[in-house]
Design a protein with these regions (language model features):
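Interfacial helix-loop-helix junctions of multi-pass membrane proteins
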Residues: 199-210, 258-265
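Aromatic-anchored segments of alpha-helical transmembrane domains
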Residues: 33-41, 118-126, 189-199, 246-255
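N-terminal membrane topogenic signal
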Residues: 16-29, 277-280
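Membrane-helix interface linkers and caps
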Residues: 8-21, 43-112, 126-141, 230-236, ...
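Juxtamembrane helix-entry segments on the extracytoplasmic side of multipass membrane proteins
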Residues: 136-153, 204-218
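Alpha-helical transmembrane segments
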Residues: 25-36, 73, 111-121, 189, ...
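Membrane-interface helix/loop boundary segments of multi-pass membrane proteins
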Residues: 162-189, 203, 232-237
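C-terminal membrane module of polytopic membrane proteins
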Residues: 48, 236-239, 243-331
Length: 331
């Protein structure tokens, strides 16, 4: 009995590794969701503000803030590092981490990463409100130093770097390789949006409503097209993805201070926009995504040869090519 026990543990571990190697994307998303939701679900199910009240207790708000700060990086970062280590070893982890400091890209891409996700919704709000919000921002340029910059730095330190290590660092190259840039982007945006779901049952992103969450999810998908476009033009730089992510969060906080709390517009957009700033985001980022698809002919800057280099570890010259063969058990 003891012999079977000691043998079965390594066998189970080996079987799990083979499963992860065979399905790295599925493994990544399962671990990413589990690593984050394990922190957030107790709050979402509790009697806290916006919680579902299924659990018969409430948890101090400070605990939620700490859990949120820990949960945001825990899932995607640990998932990307764990799956990469299993599928590609130390060399693969090293390749992934080197892309986190890939800074040699054109200055224009830095400007797009920093200001792009601020200008797109600003232009959208300008159209719907009939106000030149870019000029309004210039008139209140101090917001860039007092809100935009501090928020961006805070998000980099607490969330965006760890998140992007997983979403763009690990998942996006593999999704593009398997499904192409458009479908791969839609899948990533959808799963990224769903990953946030428990936070909508807390005071951080709640209260939950189907229209509000649907707007968030559609915006997340549309926004992911801009991320993919930047990613593909910056040699898969996780650093630029991190910067884009952080500045998008900072941009939303600036917009809150520049636009009315309740939006009222007329015309075709009224059912989407009225009473919800999220509706403007849906339209603004949706139009941006469609334009990117149109002008890049659906490629979003995707280059298969370069994308492969983001996934496969270079083989040393003269090293034998090893291929793992899956045996069916038939002789």
């Amino acid at each position: 009995m003891s012999i079977n026990t000691t043998v079965s543990q390594p066998a189970a571990s080996s079987a799990l590794k083979r499963l992860i190697i065979r399905h790295p994307l599925v493994a990544y998303f399962v671990i990413a969701f589990a690593g984050t939701w394990a922190f957030l679900l107790p709050f979402a199910l509790s009697r806290n503000v916006n919680g579902l009240g299924i659990l018969p207790f409430s948890i101090p708000d400070i605990a939620l803030i700490i859990a949120f700060v820990l949960a945001t990086p825990a899932g995607p970062a640990l998932a990307s590092l764990a799956v990469t280590a299993i599928t590609s070893g130390k060399a693969g982890v090293g390749l992934l981490l080197r892309r986190c400091v890939q800074w040699r890209v054109g200055i224009g891409w830095y400007l797009i990463a920093i200001f792009g996700l601020l200008l797109v919704p600003l232009l959208g709000y300008s159209v719907f409100l009939g106000v030149n919000l870019p000029l309004a921002l210039l008139a209140h340029s101090s917001l860039l130093l007092t809100v935009f910059l501090p928020q961006g730095v805070f998000i980099i330190l607490t969330a965006s770097f760890a998140e992007e290590l997983g979403w763009r660092g690990f998942a996006l190259p593999r999704l593009q390789q398997r499904y192409g840039p458009i479908l791969g982007t839609v899948i990533l945006g959808t799963l990224h949006g769903l990953w946030h779901l428990p936070a909508f049952f807390t005071f951080i992103l709640g209260p939950f409503s189907f229209p509000g969450y649907a707007g968030f999810l559609i915006s997340a998908i549309a926004l992911t097209f801009l991320f993919t476009w930047i990613f593909n033009h910056t040699k898969g730089s996780v650093l630029l993805a991190t910067l884009t992510h952080a500045c998008s969060n900072g941009a939303q906080n600036v917009l809150v201070l520049l636009i009315p709390a309740q939006l009222v517009v007329s015309g075709w957009a009224a059912p989407i926009v009225n009473g919800s700033w999220q509706g403007v985001n849906v339209i603004s980022f949706g139009v941006c995504a469609l334009l990117l698809i149109l002008f890049t002919r659906g490629r979003l800057g995707y280059q298969p040869e370069r994308n492969v280099q983001l996934i496969e570890v270079p083989r040393p010259a003269g090293a034998p090519l090893t291929v793992e063969v899956e045996h069916s058990g038939r002789s």
